[in-house]
């Protein structure tokens, strides 16, 4: 059976982190993914995770920290036992408007990640939908990022691929040699779940999981990370999604 992780960002609007960790353990999770808002005291966080029987196998890090203080990112990752690090986002104002700009951004990520790779940790990019907007004809930013950064690993957010108008399994296969993690999330039918920004619990939305997960399992992907960008009830999301995903 696939071991599913949980992106703690999904629970950012709910109770104290130690309660979230306990809830996830009770729900049956054994892995979590971190994000920048929770790294203030890595040793205390590691203690809470250990007590609950959870491992933080992957983490998201702001590009500014990776570039300006890579040693801090590495220290946090080691304290928490992470196996891979990803930069998760680029603000709209900072996004390139040309193919050359996206290629340069990939090179920037490649250079920023060198200390992390030298420390023995995979480092890469996590996508949204803006990487699938055509630029200068039929070129796509995600291709350009990965071309500019040939050593970058990929955490493919499967639902954002679909929102971007692409078939997730095609991109899983296209970059199977770079894929070490996926975000497992679901999209509601058009016009539904508007109070949750159009997201749905995994297995209860529009994603074709038979096609997508079968493609992922053809790769060496190590981490399957549940995420919901704005759930009304994080415990509901965590439990319903894990129950559904375990049937994939």
Would you name each region that the model predicts?
Residues 1-84:
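N-terminal pre-domain/capping segments
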Residues 7-11, 35-37, 61-64, 90-92, ...:
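Active-site beta-loop-alpha junctions enriched in small/polar residues
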Residues 114, 125, 160, 204-206:
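Gly/Ser/Thr-rich helix-start
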């Amino acid at each position: 059976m696939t071991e599913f992780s949980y992106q703690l960002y999904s629970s950012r609007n709910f109770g104290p982190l130690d309660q979230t960790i306990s809830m996830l353990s009770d729900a049956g999770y054994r892995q979590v993914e971190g994000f920048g808002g929770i790294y203030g005291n890595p040793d205390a966080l590691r203690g809470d995770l250990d007590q609950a029987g959870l491992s933080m196998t992957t983490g998201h890090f702001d590009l500014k920290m990776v570039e300006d203080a890579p040693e801090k990112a590495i220290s946090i990752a080691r304290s928490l036992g992470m196996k891979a690090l990803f930069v998760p986002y680029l603000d709209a104002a900072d996004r390139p408007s040309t193919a050359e700009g996206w290629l340069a951004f990939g090179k920037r990520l490649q250079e920023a990640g060198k200390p992390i790779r030298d420390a023995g940790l995979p480092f890469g990019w996590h996508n949204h939908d803006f990487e699938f907007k055509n630029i200068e004809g039929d070129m796509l930013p995600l291709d350009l990022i990965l071309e500019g950064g040939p050593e970058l690993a990929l955490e493919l957010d499967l639902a954002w691929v679909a929102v971007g108008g692409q078939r997730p399994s095609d991109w899983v296969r296209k970059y199977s040699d770079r894929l070490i993690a996926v975000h497992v999330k679901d999209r509601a039918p058009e016009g539904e779940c508007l109070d949750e920004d159009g997201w749905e619990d995994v297995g209860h939305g529009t994603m074709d999981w038979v096609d997508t997960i079968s493609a992922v399992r053809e790769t060496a992907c190590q981490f399957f990370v549940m995420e919901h960008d704005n759930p009304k009830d994080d415990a509901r999301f965590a439990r319903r999604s894990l129950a559904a995903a375990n049937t994939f």
